[in-house]
A protein has these predicted regions:
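A short beta-strand-loop-alpha-helix capping motif that often carries His-Thr
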Residues: 164-175
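Phosphate-coordination/substrate-recognition cap region in phosphate-metabolizing enzymes
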Residues: 35-119
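Loop-to-helix element that buttresses phosphate recognition and phosphoryl-transfer chemistry
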Residues: 3-5, 10-61, 139-144, 148
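Conserved beta-strand termini and adjacent loop/short-helix elements that scaffold enzyme active sites
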Residues: 7, 79-81, 214
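A mid-sequence, solvent-exposed acidic-amphipathic segment
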Residues: 134-163
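Short glycine/proline- and acidic residue-enriched helix-loop micro-motifs
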Residues: 103-142
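Active-site metal-binding loops of divalent metal-dependent hydrolases
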Residues: 10, 169, 215-217
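Acidic, low-complexity terminal tails and accessory targeting/binding regions
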Residues: 1-2, 85-112, 141, 156-162, ...
Length: 232
């Protein structure tokens, strides 16, 4: 039964200036994931990745591990539909729409404090989905349509064989929304709880895609690895 492995990128930089590149920990997470996949001889007939640097660097860490193990991994094909929503652009639009929102004010007081990011993202995504954040290049409906295109492309590729795709939490959570018919509120909650380099696995059946596992971290499951698990 053909399987799709969806992977979130590793931890990104700690500031808005370098969030599009992996942190040192993010590189470690990516390498560990690649080592686990290689050790379990996971083979893929196609590999896809979004165009964001943090996504491409994550795939590079996986590919390096395969190379060290002497295993073949198809070259990653860029699939723009796997790009994350533009967080900085969304926050800027949210600030224009709701300049006195408490989550925004807390973040503005300490913009590089990762602890403020989840609550700000939650409020921003709810406003975006509700249509009250409009000064953005991609509205929520367009984002949802893009995820649907990604799902169709990956499902088509699964007809040939197993697929690996590296993306981001927003894309992966909304992909799940499409498969399971989740509410927007539930999808946003899932988005915020998705771990860096977390794995989600789908199987292609006659009835379509079926979820097999969600947000798994088999490569970071040892007790001594707890400090390697991150959400932001």
């Amino acid at each position: 039964m053909p399987q799709l492995l969806l992977v979130r990128h590793g931890q990104a930089g700690a500031t808005t200036a370098n969030y599009n590149e992996l942190s040192p920990l993010g590189h470690t997470q990516s390498a560990r994931l690649g080592e686990w996949l290689a050790a379990h001889r996971r083979e893929f007939t196609a590999v896809y990745v979004g165009g964001l640097r943090r996504q491409r660097e994550t795939l590079a860490g996986i590919a390096d591990a395969y190379a060290r193990a002497g295993l073949a991994l198809p070259s990653g094909e860029e699939l723009p539909e796997l790009d994350e929503f533009r967080f900085v652009e969304l926050v800027r639009a949210f600030a224009n729409a709701q300049p006195d929102h408490p989550d925004l004010l807390r973040w503005q007081a300490a913009p590089d404090d990762r602890g403020h990011w989840p609550t700000l993202l939650r409020s921003t995504l709810h406003a975006w989905a509700a249509g009250t954040v409009t000064e953005v290049g991609e509205d929520y409906a367009a984002f949802r349509a893009r995820i649907a295109r990604a799902r169709e492309r990956l499902q088509w590729q699964l007809e040939i064989g197993p697929v690996l795709a590296v993306s981001s939490a927003g894309v992966i959570s909304h992909f799940l929304q499409d498969v399971l018919g989740l509410s927007t509120d539930a999808t946003i909650d899932i988005n915020l709880g998705y771990a860096n380099t977390g794995l989600s696995e789908y199987r292609l059946t006659r009835a379509g895609l079926k979820l097999a596992q969600w947000n798994a971290l088999p490569h970071l499951s040892a007790p001594q690895d707890r400090e390697l698990v991150t959400l932001v």
